[in-house]
């Protein structure tokens, strides 16, 4: 059988621990037998990031800007415990944060729904997509510890050297401060990405901040969203029969819990980080969540929404069998291949991605799944299989 051809390579960003193992298994079992897979490979495993002083992460992001579509494996963001484990030169920053800053994109995360996995919130009958602003805020912050008796100030120096100062706090005891920033251009890009995504999906957009408390920082987000919606998207939304809705973040959380789903929830960077995990878990599993970073100029980076599955990796190193959910990592590959096929006018590649996703969902709905889903599934006739056996079943599936 002739393999499906590709015109333009995907940017492939390899990762860490158990997801790195699954990454290679997916390629070997499900992709290279069918596709003449073209990728420009970057090893974002922590060992290689340390060897290159994290330059490989920057290089992979720039390659993504060049080629337009990337697929990324989960990676370790090191903490203090990882320093001796990997003999790190320094505590390297999150690769995702670096890539998001370079691409200035918005992260859209959507749960993968399957029969037998009932959301913990029964009213959620349709998926909720979290749109996470991927630039700035706490992820590009500056922090200090302040000794007792010190004074902390915000200082902004304009291009003419004029300073504007505001006292943060006069510390009577030891304390801490944190400086955050964002850019109006990035917020505007975030707004447009959300509105364009909504028009494509024909879904409402909800946006929430805490502008009643943060009257300059958060209020600027609110104002930019409203201005862009009114000037550029209101007529398009009305024609499509969808809405843009703004509320406070605490009210949004209450509304989300009561809702049926089926909309895009736009969140600032930290809110999106937290709420995407909450939404994914409430729908069933972080390993059943798609994630795509979309830049304002149409660049796409697909990844799983979960981490490196450290506990399973340590079992794997001991030679023990694992039953690790590969669905989100697999859907990162299918999402990237479908987008590459769309951009390069390769319907066969797009159809392959569709069929592989269909085979995955049908296999789970037929009762065959990994351990995490086995514990959640309400199906009567269900079977737990190991990591590799699940992928091999997809290889032999009629849908694939």
Identify what each model region corresponds to.
Residues 395-400:
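Conserved small/polar residues in nucleotide/adenosyl-binding loops
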Residues 4-6, 18-23, 28-52, 61-64:
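N-terminal alpha-helical transmembrane segments of multi-pass membrane transport
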Residues 48-156, 270:
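N-terminal glycine-rich phosphate/adenylate-binding segment common to multiple enzyme folds
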Residues 256-355, 359-363:
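Glycine-rich phosphate/nucleotide-binding loop
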Residues 5, 146-179:
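Gly-rich Lys/Arg/Thr-decorated short loops/hinges at beta-loop-alpha junctions or inter-strand turns
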Residues 207, 217-290:
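Accessory "access/gating" subregions that flank catalytic or transport cores
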Residues 36-41, 201-209, 233-246, 341-353, ...:
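Flexible, glycine/charged-enriched surface loops at secondary-structure junctions
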Residues 13-25, 172-246:
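Glycine-rich phosphate/diphosphate-binding loop of Rossmann-like nucleotide-binding domains
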């Amino acid at each position: 059988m002739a393999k499906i051809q590709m015109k333009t390579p995907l940017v492939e960003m390899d990762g860490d621990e158990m997801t790195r193992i699954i990454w290679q298994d997916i390629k070997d079992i499900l992709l290279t037998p069918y596709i003449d897979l073209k990728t420009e490979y970057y090893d974002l495993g922590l060992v290689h990031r340390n060897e290159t002083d994290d330059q490989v992460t920057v290089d992979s992001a720039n390659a993504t800007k060049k080629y337009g579509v990337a697929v990324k494996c989960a990676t370790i963001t090191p903490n203090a415990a990882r320093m001796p484990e990997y003999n790190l030169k320094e505590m390297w920053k999150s690769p995702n944060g670096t890539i998001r800053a370079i691409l200035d994109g918005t992260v859209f995360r959507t749960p993968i729904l399957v029969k037998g996995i009932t959301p913990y919130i029964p009213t959620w009958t349709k998926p909720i997509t979290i749109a996470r602003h991927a630039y700035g805020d706490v992820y590009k912050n500056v922090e200090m510890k302040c000794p007792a008796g010190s004074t902390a100030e915000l200082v902004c120096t304009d291009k003419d050297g004029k300073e504007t100062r505001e006292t943060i706090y006069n510390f009577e005891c030891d304390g801490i401060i944190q400086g955050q920033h964002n850019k109006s251009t990035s917020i505007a890009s975030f707004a447009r990405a959300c509105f364009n995504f909504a028009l494509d999906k024909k879904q409402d957009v909800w946006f929430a901040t805490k502008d009643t408390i943060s009257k300059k920082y958060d209020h600027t987000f609110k104002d930019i969203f409203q201005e862009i919606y009114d000037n550029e998207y209101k007529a398009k939304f009305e024609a499509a029969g969808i809405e843009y809705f703004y509320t406070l973040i605490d009210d949004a959380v209450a509304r989300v819990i009561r809702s049926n789903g089926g909309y895009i929830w736009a969140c600032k960077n930290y809110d999106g980080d937290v709420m995407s995990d909450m939404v994914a878990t409430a729908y069933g599993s972080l390993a059943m969540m798609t994630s795509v970073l979309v830049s304002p100029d149409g660049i796409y980076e697909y990844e799983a929404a979960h981490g490196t599955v450290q506990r399973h990796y340590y079992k794997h190193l001991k030679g023990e069998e694992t039953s690790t959910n590969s669905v989100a990592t697999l859907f990162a590959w299918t999402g990237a291949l479908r987008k590459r096929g769309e951009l390069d006018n390769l319907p066969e590649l797009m159809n392959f991605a569709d069929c592989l996703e269909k085979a995955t969902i049908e296999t789970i709905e037929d009762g065959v799944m990994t351990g995490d889903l086995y514990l959640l599934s309400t199906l009567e006739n269900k079977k737990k299989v190991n990591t590799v056996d699940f992928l091999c079943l997809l290889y032999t599936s009629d849908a694939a």
